[in-house]
Structure formats: structure tokens, C-alpha cells
Amino acid sequence: MKALIILGLVLLSVMVQAKVFERCELARTLKRLGMDGYRGISLANWMCLAKWESGYNTRATNYNPGDRSTDYGIFQINSRYWCNDGKTPGAVNACHLSCNALLQDNIADAVACAKRVVRDPQGIRAWVAWRNRCQNRDLRQYIQGCGV
């Protein structure tokens, strides 16, 4: 019985652990999902954005007490505008998905929503981390040696 409880706890901890992508693994995944050049945004820009928003962590979340919204996933997509977390007042849900979908190891939903974000007039400038850490910088380091 004790062994079953321990096994259950181990399995539970594995299920809730985040996938933190290796740099080149994420670069290849984003390229495969059509991010390189999407709306004129290079793969290196997406990689820099993901690095500074989440550290390549699929399960990253950050609560914003000012407007009571939360940023979700590898791109830190906000619940005020883009997804539904069931608790953000006045949420728009422009990506038409649950915020939990942005926390999955399979980042296809997160990529689709990020593509929706950049179709708005702000484009990639919607992300503060991109403006502060990536804009007008040499970003080759984010894809260097990845074969993409």
C-alpha cells in the first residue's frame, strides 16, 4: 500500500512538472509550427521573446494584481485579452481558448494564439519583454547552432 502511494505521488509530480524547452529544441519546434517569418517576424525574435517571457517554460504563469489578469505559458499570453481562465474580470478571449491550453507541453495552441496576437496593430510590440530585451538587438545567439 505504501509503495502505491509513493508511486502515485511520483506520477502526480511528473504530470504537473513543466516542460522547459532546450533552446534549439524550441527553435526547431517554432520553425516547424510556421513561426519563422510569420508576419515578418524572424524566428530569432520569437526565441528572444520566449526566453525573456518564460525562460522557455510551458507552464509559466504570472499574476498581474493591477487588472487581476494572468499571463500564461511560453509566450506569457494574457487572460485579459487573449484566453479564458474563468477568473479575469472583463476578459475578451480573442484566441477563443482556455488559458490552460497555453500551459501544455504541446505548444501548438500557444503558437496559434501568439500568431493571433501579432495580427493586431501592435504586432510583436504587444510583449513588453520583447520591447525591453529584443527590439533593435542582435538576436543571432537565440538560434545559433540550431540548424534552423
From Swiss-Prot:
Source organism per UniProt: Hylobates lar
Encoding gene, per UniProt annotation: LYZ
Ubl conjugation among keywords: no
Functional note: Lysozymes have primarily a bacteriolytic function; those in tissues and body fluids are associated with the monocyte-macrophage system and enhance the activity of immunoagents.
Family: Belongs to the glycosyl hydrolase 22 family.
Residue ranges annotated for the C-type lysozyme domain, each copy included: 19-148
The keyword Signal is assigned to this record: yes
Catalytic residues (UniProt): E53, D71
Protein name: Lysozyme C
PANTHER family reported for this sequence: LYSOZYME C
Lineage: Eukaryota, Metazoa, Chordata, Craniata, Vertebrata
